From Swiss-Prot:
InterPro entries: MORN (IPR003409), MORN_repeat_protein (IPR052849)
Source species taxonomy: Eukaryota, Metazoa, Chordata, Craniata, Vertebrata
A Pfam family this chain is assigned to: MORN
Family matches, as Gene3D superfamilies: Histone H3 K4-specific methyltransferase SET7/9 N-terminal domain
Keyword Cell wall biogenesis/degradation annotated: no
Keywords recorded for this protein, A-Z: Repeat
Cited SUPFAM superfamilies: Histone H3 K4-specific methyltransferase SET7/9 N-terminal domain (SSF82185)
Keyword RNA-binding: no
Species this chain originates from: Bos taurus
Source domain of life: Eukaryota
Repeat (MORN) residue spans along the chain: 15-37, 38-60
Annotated protein name in UniProt: MORN repeat-containing protein 2
Length: 79
């Protein structure tokens, strides 16, 4: 698949965004089965670059993601 699309996994996970060669690639949103969500850049099925992670409590974390690491994340406060 290439271009924009939506993939729903039987686990409840959902990816909506850009695909390249059947992989998450470019901007997209991945919603985890527990309701947490990552919105940002993907590179060959991996989170890569600027993005935002919203945890199950609704807290929003912004920063630079690199596969399983996210050094220097910032908590976004709504006042």
């Amino acid at each position: 698949m290439n271009g924009f699309g939506r993939l729903e996994h039987f686990s409840g996970a959902i990816y909506e965004g850009h695909f390249k060669d059947n992989m998450f690639h470019g901007l997209g949103t991945y919603t985890f089965p527990n309701g947490a969500k990552y919105t940002g850049n993907f590179n060959e099925n991996r989170v890569e670059g600027e993005g935002q992670y919203t945890d199950i409590q609704g807290l929003e974390w912004c920063g630079n993601f690199h596969f399983t690491a996210a050094p220097g994340l910032r908590l976004k406060l709504h006042m």
